[in-house]
């Protein structure tokens, strides 16, 4: 359908690409904390970031999204990349077995859901989160005004990196 095609194209747009590349550029130094880390990308859409992460590990890479179509499309787009796609809700997904836990869609999730999701990770895992201030998108229910506000909302023990990526109409934080 047209809606699906637009969604796939949007998942690969310039801002998405810049955001994913920025995540890897600023985070890859921490991947070495683990030998062949296992990685989970929550709300991973069609798996573009999971595909990029696969270049940095021989460990398991999982991309999950609550939309079952993301799994179907992801399998087709990234066939042969050894990525596990699953349709699951972040509300229930168990992330305990993963060394690296990523969510680049925090603006789509309520704060309570993010907090509960992070409580389920294993101690010592690397958490990489992104959120933006693109308030004008209806689905963006959890935007913040700046990176400090975002950071405070997370209640994390230790912050290894914080930064801002300026994009066309908004800023992205990590």
Each model region followed by its residue ranges:
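S-adenosyl-L-methionine
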Residues: 1-34, 66-100
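Conserved SAM-binding loop of SAM-dependent methyltransferases across substrates and taxa
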Residues: 46-57
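Conserved class I S-adenosyl-L-methionine
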Residues: 34-46
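C-terminal substrate-binding/active-site "lid" region of AdoMet-derived donor-dependent transferases
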Residues: 111-174
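A short SAM/SAH-binding and catalytic strip from SAM-dependent methyltransferases
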Residues: 98-113
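Conserved SAM-binding motif I beta-strand of class I
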Residues: 59-65
